[in-house]
């Protein structure tokens, strides 16, 4: 088992529907620890920079627009195999295809407004964490 860190964002739809606590509880029940967190209203520059990898794809403008509609909760999660564990808890990108009991099956409405974002690989997690957090803002947790 590998101790990893991953970035998780609770998106504007889930924040607006007051699902922050329920989503965090699922991460913690799965053994993931929050080692950094902040609520932030993304502006266009923030969203475009974070999702720059998708620039030029048909959904880019809608994604950037959606991510700036309200505040988001941004967290660094830490735990054994945190990246894959987080992705399992989130469920498939399309909530209609997400397994029952996953965050997206329970809280997302559409593939565009799908409640959460999670890093997909170790390299991506590192880049995404550094986009939102300085290293001194990430707190190691021993217990």
Curated annotation (Swiss-Prot):
<keyword id="KW-0597">Phosphoprotein</keyword>
<feature type="binding site">
    <location>
        <position position="93"/>
    </location>
    <ligand>
        <name>ATP</name>
    </ligand>
</feature>
<feature type="binding site">
    <location>
        <position position="87"/>
    </location>
    <ligand>
        <name>ATP</name>
    </ligand>
</feature>
<keyword id="KW-0963">Cytoplasm</keyword>
<keyword id="KW-0067">ATP-binding</keyword>
<feature type="binding site">
    <location>
        <position position="104"/>
    </location>
    <ligand>
        <name>ATP</name>
    </ligand>
</feature>
<dbReference type="GO" id="GO:0046872">
    <property type="term" value="F:metal ion binding"/>
</dbReference>
<dbReference type="InterPro" id="IPR001564">
    <property type="entry name" value="Nucleoside_diP_kinase"/>
</dbReference>
<keyword id="KW-0808">Transferase</keyword>
<comment type="similarity">
    <text>Belongs to the NDK family.</text>
</comment>
<keyword id="KW-0547">Nucleotide-binding</keyword>
<feature type="active site" description="Pros-phosphohistidine intermediate">
    <location>
        <position position="117"/>
    </location>
</feature>
<feature type="binding site">
    <location>
        <position position="114"/>
    </location>
    <ligand>
        <name>ATP</name>
    </ligand>
</feature>
<keyword id="KW-0546">Nucleotide metabolism</keyword>
<comment type="function">
    <text>Major role in the synthesis of nucleoside triphosphates other than ATP. The ATP gamma phosphate is transferred to the NDP beta phosphate via a ping-pong mechanism, using a phosphorylated active-site intermediate.</text>
</comment>
<dbReference type="GO" id="GO:0006183">
    <property type="term" value="P:GTP biosynthetic process"/>
</dbReference>
<feature type="binding site">
    <location>
        <position position="11"/>
    </location>
    <ligand>
        <name>ATP</name>
    </ligand>
</feature>
<dbReference type="GO" id="GO:0006228">
    <property type="term" value="P:UTP biosynthetic process"/>
</dbReference>
<protein>
    <recommendedName>
        <fullName>Nucleoside diphosphate kinase 2</fullName>
        <ecNumber>2.7.4.6</ecNumber>
    </recommendedName>
</protein>
<dbReference type="GO" id="GO:0006241">
    <property type="term" value="P:CTP biosynthetic process"/>
</dbReference>
<dbReference type="Pfam" id="PF00334">
    <property type="entry name" value="NDK"/>
</dbReference>
<dbReference type="InterPro" id="IPR036850">
    <property type="entry name" value="NDK-like_dom_sf"/>
</dbReference>
<dbReference type="GO" id="GO:0004550">
    <property type="term" value="F:nucleoside diphosphate kinase activity"/>
</dbReference>
<dbReference type="InterPro" id="IPR034907">
    <property type="entry name" value="NDK-like_dom"/>
</dbReference>
<keyword id="KW-0460">Magnesium</keyword>
<comment type="subunit">
    <text>Homotetramer.</text>
</comment>
<keyword id="KW-0479">Metal-binding</keyword>
<dbReference type="GO" id="GO:0005524">
    <property type="term" value="F:ATP binding"/>
</dbReference>
<dbReference type="GO" id="GO:0005737">
    <property type="term" value="C:cytoplasm"/>
</dbReference>
<keyword id="KW-0418">Kinase</keyword>
<feature type="binding site">
    <location>
        <position position="59"/>
    </location>
    <ligand>
        <name>ATP</name>
    </ligand>
</feature>
């Amino acid at each position: 088992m590998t101790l990893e860190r991953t970035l998780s964002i609770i998106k504007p739809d889930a924040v607006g529907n007051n699902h922050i606590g329920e989503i965090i509880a699922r991460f913690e029940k799965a053994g993931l620890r929050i080692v950094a967190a902040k609520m932030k209203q993304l502006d266009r520059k923030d969203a475009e920079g974070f999702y720059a990898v998708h620039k030029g794809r048909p959904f880019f403008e809608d994604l950037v627009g959606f991510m700036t509609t309200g505040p988001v909760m941004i967290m660094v999660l830490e735990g054994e195999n945190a990246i894959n564990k987080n992705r399992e808890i989130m469920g498939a990108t399309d909530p209609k295809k997400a397994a029952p009991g996953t965050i997206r099956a329970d809280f997302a409405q559409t593939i565009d407004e799908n409640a959460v974002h999670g890093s997909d690989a170790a390299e991506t997690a590192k880049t995404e964490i550094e986009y939102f957090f300085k290293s001194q803002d990430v707190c190691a947790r021993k217990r």
